[in-house]
């Protein structure tokens, strides 16, 4: 004798009536094949959040397994790009026709890129945290890409103070000499006595969020990373030889920046490209001098766009 299994979500009503903004699952772990412009398709280990709204005040609940199976189908049979993300959101809603008219999904993963060293030509892997978010609200679509890009920042104020101490050390060393030989100054500058102080610097992170449109299919992950690193000039390195470390020191010295400077550089660069409908960025200088971070936030500044 065949026994049918009870389906509580379909055949019972809510004990207390009410609509719900979002119902679903968070932190689903799945391998996902990602398409990034200019890169070969590659598998990433993603943490996924999937939700729909519950507009039927009397319905017991949504069908979470339907959301899960749609994501699993993407994982096993498709590639994550702009169009497949839109199709996934459509599937969330069509699988809950009487219950939902809104859907959202978020994929969080590290995207690894091969990055060349500054001088030696050596290469190494760097991992960039990426968040892809899709939201479909009564036919209105929003697709967002967020990337964290690490770099080094050296404090302009600290650099000025260090230069002052070096000047004083130079004066103390050579004040009594009426004539100076170039070799004496050259040799002195190569000692720890000559470089008596160095400015403080720290690893920093630029969080860049852009709003994408249908003109993009493969996600511009590498393009955004390149834009940030080329604008700020001091990217955190992977493989490093001594000549690379020396060049890194030079770049830091030639690109002194407060968090405000970094934010304005990226704001200018992002304003030069028209492929993003909107952008939001946050600069985080993880201070080595202070026990707090220095932060700057800015947006494209369009009407009804991102807010700081």
Curated annotation (Swiss-Prot):
Looking up Pfam families in the UniProt record yields:
GCHY-1 (PF02649)
The protein's matches in Gene3D superfamilies, at most eight in alphabetical order, are given as: Urate Oxidase (3.10.270.10)
Marked site positions, May be catalytically important: 155
- Catalytic function, reaction form: GTP + H2O = 7,8-dihydroneopterin 3'-triphosphate + formate + H(+)
Keywords of the record, alphabetical order, are: Hydrolase
**Tree of life domain:** Bacteria
EC top class named in words: hydrolase
| Pathway info | Cofactor biosynthesis; 7,8-dihydroneopterin triphosphate biosynthesis; 7,8-dihydroneopterin triphosphate from GTP: step 1/1
GO process annotations (BP): tetrahydrofolate biosynthetic process
InterPro entries in the record:
GTP_cyclohydrolase_FolE2, GTP_cyclohydrolase_FolE2/MptA
Q: Give the Gene Ontology MF terms in alphabetical order.
A: GTP cyclohydrolase I activity
Q: What EC number(s) is this enzyme filed under?
A: 3.5.4.16
Q: What's the family?
A: Belongs to the GTP cyclohydrolase IV family.
Q: What does this protein do?
A: Converts GTP to 7,8-dihydroneopterin triphosphate.
Q: Per its record, how is this protein called by name? A: GTP cyclohydrolase FolE2
């Amino acid at each position: 004798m065949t026994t049918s299994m009870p389906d509580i979500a379909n055949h019972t009503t809510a004990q207390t009536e009410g609509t719900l903004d979002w119902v679903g699952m968070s932190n689903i772990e799945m391998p996902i094949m990602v398409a990034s412009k200019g890169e070969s398709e590659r598998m990433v280990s993603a943490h996924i959040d999937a939700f729909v709204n519950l507009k039927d005040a009397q319905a017991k609940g949504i069908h979470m397994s339907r959301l899960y199976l749609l994501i699993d189908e993407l994982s096993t049979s498709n590639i994550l790009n702009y169009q497949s993300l839109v199709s996934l959101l459509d599937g969330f809603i069509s699988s809950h026709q009487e219950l939902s008219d809104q859907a959202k999904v978020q994929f969080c993963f590290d995207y690894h890129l091969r990055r060349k060293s500054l001088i030696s030509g050596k290469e190494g892997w760097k991992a960039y945290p990426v968040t892809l978010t899709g939201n479909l609200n009564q036919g209105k679509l929003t697709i967002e890409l967020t990337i964290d890009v690490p770099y080094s920042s050296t404090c302009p104020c600290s650099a000025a103070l260090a230069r002052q101490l070096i000047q004083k050390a130079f004066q103390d060393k050579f004040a009594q000499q009426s004539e100076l030989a170039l070799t004496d100054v050259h040799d002195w500058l190569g000692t720890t006595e000559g470089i008596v102080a160095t400015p403080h610097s720290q690893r920093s992170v630029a969080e860049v969020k852009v709003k994408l449109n249908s003109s993009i299919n493969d996600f511009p992950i590498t393009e955004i990373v390149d834009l940030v690193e080329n604008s700020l000039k001091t990217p955190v390195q992977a493989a490093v030889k001594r000549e690379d470390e020396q060049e890194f020191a030079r770049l830091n010295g030639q690109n002194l920046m407060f968090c405000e400077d970094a934010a304005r550089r990226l704001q200018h660069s992002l304003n030069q490209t028209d492929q993003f409908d909107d952008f939001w960025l946050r600069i985080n200088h993880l201070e080595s001098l202070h026990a707090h971070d220095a932060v700057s936030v800015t947006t494209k500044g369009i009407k009804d766009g991102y807010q700081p």
